[in-house]
């Protein structure tokens, strides 16, 4: 509610800009003694067109308001009425009232309250005197001030341009935020999920599938060159056979191959003659460590470990069905440098990896299709052989039961393991040439390398070790690796 500011205080609005305090006191002093004349001015000390006059007697103020209201003063009609306090200034500091002209106080009050209720300034003069130049600046000032504390959204009562601008800006801001959220979420869907799928699929291809990893399948199923560098070398039966046994073997073989640097490889896998087998190779689990280290060596390390190997890796590993997948993986994918990387170390652990009679035969046939899915296949080798491997193992077992480990080549039928192993002291010479093929028919069909070693035909006269000895005994392997005459064979298969 608007209440009277002071009983003897009047608001005079619509004054001429030239009217000053002395003129007002002279005109209104006729009605009674005046205690105060307050002319409202702007920053430039010019009159704003309204003033407040305080009479000592309230009755004199009422008489002056009735007499002077609507009359002309210095060429302009003025408005005189009782000064009122704004609702937010009751009991506080009093604001000067503006002058009114030719309008009733009640009408001005209703209009001001209806249109701009709650704004600052003196209510009787806020509505009707926008054209006289006296109160317009105060109205604009009050209007701008009134909007500052009320910033909760578009004002229904004041409804000026600023709220209209602010509302669309807020909407646009929210829309732009929502629009940006949409593409961002869409980008997340487009770019975040497929890499995860690709990772899963690659994981499946690396660990779940045996036929499509480039181990023992057609050329079209082999991985890329980089994948071959990581995964194809183990296709000789090493790492994937190790991965099929236990998680410990898998992490040891793959982890060391993927994460060890060349310097670490030199530290952990020295190129001593059969040293890797003597240190790590007495169990299948230990083989994964030595193989994992050797598979990741760079060409420089391989040249340091095995200088003479320049193309004989195919001849070493390609002449048995067991080595067929490995030779194909090498022939199809790695470069000559990769061949130098992976092929030369065969003289160190070729017998270690392949030299177990029935056990190795199973690794050639069984591991490519079965060993990645069960641990028992890798643990109990003599009980889980495939058909042909089992037949070959029995034949070998029948001819070599109770025979001591021989340095001569090991033979088998059906095109399976029939490479001649003869360890040599000259391991940096041509020891890999001692792995000559005897009857590898599958390799001839697939790779068109049908050069059988004519100098060492297959014969059962050269007895083989007991499969149980080949599987379980590490002393047998150590004796073969450490002691043996070099039966290096320079055949027509030394050049591929």
Curated annotation (Swiss-Prot):
Residues 175-184 have a biased composition (Polar residues). One of its GO terms (cellular component) is nucleolus. Keywords: mRNA processing, mRNA splicing, Nucleus, RNA-binding. It is found in: Nucleus. Signal peptide: none annotated. Its main location: nucleus. GO terms for molecular function: RNA binding. Residues 97-114, 149-159 have a biased composition (Low complexity). The keyword tRNA processing does not apply. InterPro entries: Nucleotide-bd_a/b_plait_sf, RBD_domain_sf, RBM, RBM1CTR, RRM_dom. It comes from the Eukaryota. The RBMY1 proteins are encoded by repeated regions of the Y chromosome, mostly within the AZFb region. The exact number of functional copies is unclear and may vary between individuals, and some of them may represent pseudogenes. The proteins are very similar, which makes the characterization of each protein difficult. Thus, most experiments do not discriminate between the different members. One can therefore suppose that reported interactions with a RBMY1 protein involve all the proteins. Interacts with splicing factor proteins SFRS3/SRP20, TRA2B/SFRS10, KHDRBS1/SAM68 and KHDRBS3. RNA-binding protein which may be involved in spermatogenesis. Required for sperm development, possibly by participating in pre-mRNA splicing in the testis. This is RNA-binding motif protein, Y chromosome, family 1 member D. It comes from Homo sapiens (Human).
């Amino acid at each position: 509610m608007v209440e009277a500011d002071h009983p003897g205080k009047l608001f005079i609005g619509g004054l001429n800009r030239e009217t000053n305090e002395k003129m007002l006191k002279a005109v209104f002093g006729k009605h009674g003694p005046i205690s105060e004349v307050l002319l409202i001015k702007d920053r430039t000390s010019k009159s704003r067109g309204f003033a407040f006059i305080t009479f000592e007697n309230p009755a004199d103020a009422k008489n002056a308001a009735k007499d002077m209201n609507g009359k002309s003063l210095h060429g302009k009609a003025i408005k005189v009425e009782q000064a009122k306090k704004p609702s937010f200034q009751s009991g506080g500091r009093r604001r000067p009232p503006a002058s009114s002209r030719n309008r009733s106080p009640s009408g001005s009050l209703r209009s001001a309250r209806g249109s701009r209720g709650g704004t600052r300034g003196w209510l009787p003069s806020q509505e009707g005197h926008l054209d006289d130049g006296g109160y317009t600046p105060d109205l604009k000032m009050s209007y701008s001030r009134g909007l500052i504390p009320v910033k909760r959204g578009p004002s229904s009562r004041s409804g000026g341009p600023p709220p209209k601008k602010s509302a669309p800006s807020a909407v646009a801001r929210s829309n732009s935020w929502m629009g940006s959220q949409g593409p961002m979420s869409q980008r997340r869907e487009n770019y975040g999920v497929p890499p995860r799928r690709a990772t899963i699929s690659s994981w499946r291809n690396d660990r779940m599938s045996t036929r499509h990893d480039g181990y023992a399948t057609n050329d079209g199923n082999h991985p890329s060159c980089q994948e071959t560098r990581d995964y194809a070398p183990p296709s000789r039966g090493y790492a994937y056979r190790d991965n099929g046994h236990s998680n410990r073997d898998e992490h040891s073989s793959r982890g060391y191959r993927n994460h060890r640097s060349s310097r670490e490889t030199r530290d952990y896998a020295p190129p001593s003659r059969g040293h890797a087998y003597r240190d790590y190779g007495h169990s299948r689990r230990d083989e994964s460590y030595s193989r994992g280290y050797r598979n990741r060596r760079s060409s420089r390390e391989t040249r340091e470990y095995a200088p003479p190997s320049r193309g004989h890796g195919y001849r070493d590993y390609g002449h048995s069905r067991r080595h067929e997948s490995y030779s194909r993986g090498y022939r199809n994918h790695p470069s000559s440098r990769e061949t130098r990387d992976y092929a030369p170390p065969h003289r160190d652990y070729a017998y270690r990896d392949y030299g177990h009679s029935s056990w190795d035969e199973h690794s050639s046939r069984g591991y490519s299709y079965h060993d990645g899915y069960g641990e028992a296949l890798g643990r109990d080798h003599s009980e889980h052989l495939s058909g042909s491997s089992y037949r070959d193992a029995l034949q070998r077992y029948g001819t070599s039961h109770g025979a001591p480990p021989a340095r001569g080549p090991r033979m088998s039928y059906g095109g399976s393991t029939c490479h001649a192993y003869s360890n040599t002291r000259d391991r940096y010479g041509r020891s890999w040439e001692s792995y000559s093929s005897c009857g590898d028919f599958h390799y001839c069909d697939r790779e068109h390398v049908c050069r059988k070693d004519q100098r060492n035909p297959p014969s059962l006269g050269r007895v083989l070790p007991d499969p149980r000895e080949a599987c379980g005994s590490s002393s047998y392997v150590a004796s073969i690796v450490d002691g043996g005459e070099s039966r290096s064979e320079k055949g027509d298969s030394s050049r591929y």
